[in-house]
């Protein structure tokens, strides 16, 4: 059972209670704070599409604290970030690992951030399969195609040579916020809230 705090706002028409995520959405903040799967991807995508419809010219902030997860769910979020008109500002608060690091790097250029004690990790996609040899081969080939796609996009978003991305993603590659900035995953480290 997860607990979601409720906040109460005073307005000229009285009090209004919101769950914390709805309140953040009013400020154009989408929070990705869980494993990336089809459910979390659908929620993030729906919020981005809603915010685009509300104001297509105003930035959307995507706060990320996630261990990563499904490649296809992550690519659905990535494609939506590229598709919508507003810039998506990304901010790592805590951890952005695997697919979450990929999304962090996919924010609008100049608008990708991390808090000082954030940790970022990239690695190659992994998966498991059992069954007939031909089915295992099909899934292995698919995984290699996805890996190639992720490496190319990450190279484009970070400015790192493709060969360096390939080498660094061979194993878990952990970075501090400062190292992620040098690497090109983020553009700056936020110490104080920028208004």
From Swiss-Prot:
It catalyses: Hydrolysis of proteins to small peptides in the presence of ATP and magnesium. alpha-casein is the usual test substrate. In the absence of ATP, only oligopeptides shorter than five residues are hydrolyzed (such as succinyl-Leu-Tyr-|-NHMec, and Leu-Tyr-Leu-|-Tyr-Trp, in which cleavage of the -Tyr-|-Leu- and -Tyr-|-Trp bonds also occurs). It is found in: Cytoplasm. One of its GO terms (molecular function) is ATPase binding. GO terms for biological process: protein quality control for misfolded or incompletely synthesized proteins. The keyword Transport does not apply. The keyword Protease applies. The active site is at 98 (nucleophile), 123. This is ATP-dependent Clp protease proteolytic subunit.
